[in-house]
């Protein structure tokens, strides 16, 4: 990358440790949830390596030394290598660290405003992820029922909650048994994205699968969804907060069921798409999904061209 000034690597490197309370990257990361912290730390490490030809990471780079020519070069390099969504996420991390450097009086106002004056990369318009079909969901659940045992029963409960609750995997791993009201199907999300509280509802079918799981888990206080070893022994603790365990669980079930690859987040896309297809207004779906705006919810709509085709057919010619 000739346009990145690798000769400046030494100038951008911290020459002595900085207290975490005065390190812009550390201050920024401390404001995030555990799951977001891991993702953004990875982004900052990548940016630091890019700027210094691999010599620095997020904590050894002196972010206060960055100027517009550095950030503009980072944007160009990321745009060439990565998808627009990933690039923009990394640019958010870059801007936020520079903001903390400014707040900590490590960079003057003029240099700061120039350095963060980099625009997002425009997307291609192609939607990420997909919605699952009814047949695929049935195959996933059938795979669990046919296998039997504690792991399969737990997995069926996980799939039921993701499918009918439309929640994020990070929200799922934080659920306590007290968050679920089996009588009403209410599932309380105490701390969703952005620290938001909301209530979602499970269908009777989903409740039945969760009840089957609770019969072997027991009603002891603690994590609603727990790890189970190969011997069927249940450990009453939460999965890791980043939700990686749920990702692996879903991936394994998809392979066993012969279902084309999808992510846990695709259950949210399916949830939103199906509710919109049933005629629910976008604001109700937004509340259930815990989105900040209906515009975000609209991006989750995977009903495809058939929706538009049917809408036009309902028009009267005159």
Where are these regions (language model features)?
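Conserved catalytic core of the tyrosine transesterase superfamily
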Residues: 1-318
């Amino acid at each position: 990358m000739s346009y990145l000034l690798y000769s400046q690597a030494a100038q951008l490197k911290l020459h002595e440790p900085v207290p975490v309370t005065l390190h812009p990257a550390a201050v920024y990361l401390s404001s995030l949830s555990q799951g977001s912290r891991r993702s953004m730390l990875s982004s900052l490490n990548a940016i630091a390596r890019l700027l210094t030809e691999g010599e620095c990471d997020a904590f050894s780079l002196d972010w206060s030394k960055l100027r517009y020519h550095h950030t503009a070069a980072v944007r160009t390099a990321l745009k060439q290598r990565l998808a627009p969504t990933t690039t923009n996420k990394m640019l958010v991390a870059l801007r936020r660290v520079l903001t903390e450097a400014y707040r900590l009086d490590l960079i003057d106002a003029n240099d700061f405003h120039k350095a963060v004056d980099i625009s997002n990369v425009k997307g291609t318009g192609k939607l990420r992820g997909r919605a699952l079909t009814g047949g695929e969901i049935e195959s996933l659940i059938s795979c669990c029922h046919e296998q039997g045992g504690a792991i399969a029963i737990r997995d069926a409960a996980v799939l039921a909650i993701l499918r009918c609750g439309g929640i994020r995997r990070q929200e799922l791993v934080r659920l306590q048994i007290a968050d679920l009201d089996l009588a009403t199907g209410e599932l309380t999300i105490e701390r969703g994205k952005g620290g938001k509280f909301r209530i979602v509802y499970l269908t009777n079918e989903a409740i039945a699968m969760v009840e089957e799981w609770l019969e072997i888990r027991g009603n002891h206080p603690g994590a609603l969804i727990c790890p189970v070893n190969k011997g069927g022994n249940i450990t009453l603790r939460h999965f890791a907060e980043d939700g990686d365990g749920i990702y692996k669980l879903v991936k394994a079930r998809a392979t066993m069921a012969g279902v084309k690859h999808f992510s846990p987040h695709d259950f949210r896309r399916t949830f939103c798409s199906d509710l919109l297809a049933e005629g629910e207004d976008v604001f109700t779906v937004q509340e259930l999904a815990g989105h900040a705006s209906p515009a975000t919810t609209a991006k989750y709509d995977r009903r495809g061209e058939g929706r538009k085709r049917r809408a036009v057919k309902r028009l009267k010619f005159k």
